[in-house]
A protein has these predicted regions:
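Hydrophobic anchor at the beta1->P-loop junction of P-loop NTPases
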Residues: 22
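P-loop (Walker A) phosphate-binding loop of NTP-binding proteins
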Residues: 25
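ATP-binding Walker
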Residues: 28
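Walker A/P-loop
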Residues: 31
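ATP-dependent small-molecule kinase phosphotransfer cores
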Residues: 40, 44-102, 116-118, 125-136, ...
Length: 192
């Protein structure tokens, strides 16, 4: 992939043994599953959202406002920090594109999906807003993310070939997801 991502990785040595990346769009359940995987493996959990929120706070913007601005420098700062964390310690990272950012530095790449209605319900509950408002925010954000990632990184969010595990959790609870991922972890890392 010819993009800035390669520049982020050049001349970097991986000092970690296990890095798990969990990708998905807004409301897909990345953070929730990442906490479970972190618990299973006993690893630190990092969320690219935390870096994003801290940048929004520094600029006195809501995360929705910053997402609308979505300056290239913000995306690159988040991705650089994500990569630095993954290279320096065993961890679980969740973001929309962490598997793309880390590429082969990720030892297990998971993609979560859920239909728009379920994602809107989750975001509405988390943000304490109406489901309709959440849906509009998600649709706008998904469209913007897809365009940005294509422009900045040549990433096609529809391309799922890089993932080791795809989970549609529209109708799956967290315990069911945990079981699926635990089996994949046991197979990949001989971890029980």
């Amino acid at each position: 992939m010819e993009s800035y991502i390669q520049d982020l990785k050049d001349d970097r040595q991986k000092k970690s043994d296990i890095v798990v990346t969990i990708d998905g769009l807004a409301g897909a359940g990345k953070g929730t599953l990442a906490e479970q995987v972190s618990d299973i493996l006993g690893l630190k959990h990092f969320s690219a959202s935390d870096v994003f929120y801290s940048i929004a706070e520094e600029r006195n913007l809501s995360d929705h406002e910053l997402s609308e601005e979505a300056e290239k420098e913000v995306d690159l700062a988040v991705d650089r920090k994500t990569l630095e964390r993954a290279l320096n310690q065993d961890c679980v990272i969740d973001s929309r594109i962490s598997s793309w950012v880390l590429g082969t530095y990720s030892d297990l790449r998971i993609r979560l999906e859920a239909d728009i209605e379920e994602r809107a319900r989750r975001v509405a509950e988390r943000e304490n807003i109406s489901t309709e408002k959440a849906r509009k925010i998600i649709e706008k954000r998904d469209k913007g993310d897809k365009k940005r990632y294509s422009q900045y990184y040549s990433i096609d969010l529809e391309n799922k070939e890089i993932y080791d595990l795809l989970i549609d959790n529209t109708d799956l609870g967290i315990e069911e997801q945990r079981k699926v991922v635990k089996k994949a972890i046991e197979k990949r890392f001989d971890h029980k």
